[in-house]
């Protein structure tokens, strides 16, 4: 993929308490954890088009920290298709990322290296989104990444 992160000026943000998605489904008193994420001007000014919700959102949806699954703070949670655009990067470099929710916390750190990132979650994507592939305007020489947790 041949890129380097040139901006090391991140602000660390923390949220407590963090329990995770399964907390409400187990009959146990689990000690709270803390969720941490990095941000900067590039991340704060990136636009995220959510195809499922048909709207532009922010990379970090901080209001979602109060949801049952506060991990949804990253790119508004599980969704089939997102297009992230970085107005500060005029390289034209693009990334297509096939992913699960694990990648939602990684993708923000890749934004500064790309003009556009297309994120496809194969668990949720339907043919109605894939039929619109030409609308994504993905370049033929775009980088492609597959990232899944185990």
Q: How would you describe each model-predicted region?
A:
Residues 1-150:
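Extracellular glycan-modifying ectodomains
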